[in-house]
Amino acid sequence: MTKKKSSGGALIAQNKKARHLYELLEFFEAGIALAGTEVKSLRAGQVSFTDSYVTIHNNEAWIVGMHIAPYANAGYVQHDPDRDRKLLLHAREIDTLRARVEQKGLTVVPVKLYFKNSRVKLEIAVGRGKKLHDKRQDIKQRDVERETRREIMRH
């Protein structure tokens, strides 16, 4: 009897820095066009996209700055680790992203990378850069919440 594959998304990587640096406003799920060795490297968790962002050229969305390490067992045929990768989105989603990016101060950043039904998906978000005082305010708010949870646990 064969085991049924779980349809749940296995998290590959998460961009924690994006939530710290940006106020995330709107989220999208995008497929990503990859080579076979890139998928094998992702299964091994060898990816970094902390400084990456999404651009739109010729009605196509591309992720720039995502590093997928070369697959160790691939031999002499390897992928370029730092190449721009095409995102698979519907045309209306690309139009929405273009409209948001043309607004002043908004950018599109990757948030997390995961498997969904054995396909690699990338969650991207439209975000506005936080100012220093916004970051400090978030840290203060987090500390207050932590203290209230501690007090509740004590009593």
Swiss-Prot record:
InterPro entries: SmpB (IPR023620), SsrA-bd_prot (IPR000037), SsrA-bd_prot_CS (IPR020081). One of its GO terms (biological process) is trans-translation. SUPFAM superfamilies: Small protein B (SmpB). The keyword Transcription does not apply. Residues 135-155 are annotated as: Disordered. It comes from the Bacteria. It is found in: Cytoplasm. One of its GO terms (cellular component) is cytosol. Its main location: cytoplasm. The keyword ATP-binding does not apply. Required for rescue of stalled ribosomes mediated by trans-translation. Binds to transfer-messenger RNA (tmRNA), required for stable association of tmRNA with ribosomes. tmRNA and SmpB together mimic tRNA shape, replacing the anticodon stem-loop with SmpB. tmRNA is encoded by the ssrA gene; the 2 termini fold to resemble tRNA(Ala) and it encodes a 'tag peptide', a short internal open reading frame. During trans-translation Ala-aminoacylated tmRNA acts like a tRNA, entering the A-site of stalled ribosomes, displacing the stalled mRNA. NCBIfam families: PRK05422.1, smpB. Belongs to the SmpB family. This is SsrA-binding protein. It comes from Oleidesulfovibrio alaskensis (strain ATCC BAA-1058 / DSM 17464 / G20) (Desulfovibrio alaskensis). The lineage of its organism: Bacteria, Pseudomonadati, Thermodesulfobacteriota, Desulfovibrionia, Desulfovibrionales.
